[in-house]
Design a protein with these regions (language model features):
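Short, small/acidic-rich helices and loops at N termini and domain boundaries
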Residues: 1-43
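Glycine-biased, small-residue-rich flexible motifs in mid-sequence functional cores and linkers
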Residues: 31-32, 39-198
Length: 198
């Protein structure tokens, strides 16, 4: 009647039956201080929507921290997890300049360049957006180490994955376009030929 295939009909039925579970999950997330920002919200990052367009921009993001950071001018510093000293020094210099120019630093919280970018942003009194390769509720150790920065409004943590999704390499690769999409400028400190930077 509505031009829906049998497969789509089954999917709709399954989705309908799972709605109560998602309602409880959303309520639980809100009680824990997380925010859910759909692509239709004015709080959704404009840069992400403009860079990835509606075709690729995630329809929903999960955040914790100062959501005003989502609308500020930002740069991304990306590179190898096994970055050498020169690359980490380069990252530190770029981060320092970004803080001076009042730009947000977007990073992925991986070791190497990502972690250096975040640490330098904090060291120089700047602000940062951390884009997770996992669900936002599985980042408990990270929330503990960044507690002071999150509370003070200097760091926002963001995920586009199911809130309970554990880290895996596939999510780490899928996270990278979000980092690029969040930034107006991208600096590559070091990239391995077999790595996941690109």
């Amino acid at each position: 009647e509505f031009g829906v295939s049998d497969e789509e009909s089954l999917w709709l039925e399954k989705s309908k039956s799972e709605l109560p579970n998602y309602a409880f999950l959303v309520e639980d997330l809100l009680e824990q201080g997380y925010e859910l920002i759909p692509i239709t919200s004015p709080n959704y990052p404009r840069t992400l929507k403009n860079n990835l367009k509606k075709t690729y921009a995630p329809t929903l993001i999960y955040t914790k921290g100062n959501k005003q950071l989502l609308q500020e001018n930002s740069i991304a510093i990306v590179g190898s997890r096994q970055a050498g000293g020169d690359s980490l020094s380069f990252t530190d210099v770029i981060a320092k300049q970004a803080v001076y120019n009042k730009k947000i630093i977007v990073s992925g919280y991986a070791k190497g360049v990502d972690k250096q970018a975040l640490d330098s942003a904090i060291k120089y009194g700047g602000k940062s957006i951390v884009v997770l390769p996992q669900g936002i509720t599985t980042f408990s150790s990270g929330f503990k180490s960044l507690y002071k920065e999150i509370i003070s409004g200097r760091v926002l943590v963001l995920s586009v994955f199911h809130p309970k999704a554990s880290w895996n390499a596939g999510l780490a690769m899928a996270r990278n376009p979000i980092i690029y999409g969040m930034a107006s400028e991208i600096f590559v400190a070091e990239s391995d030929s077999k790595g996941g930077t690109w």
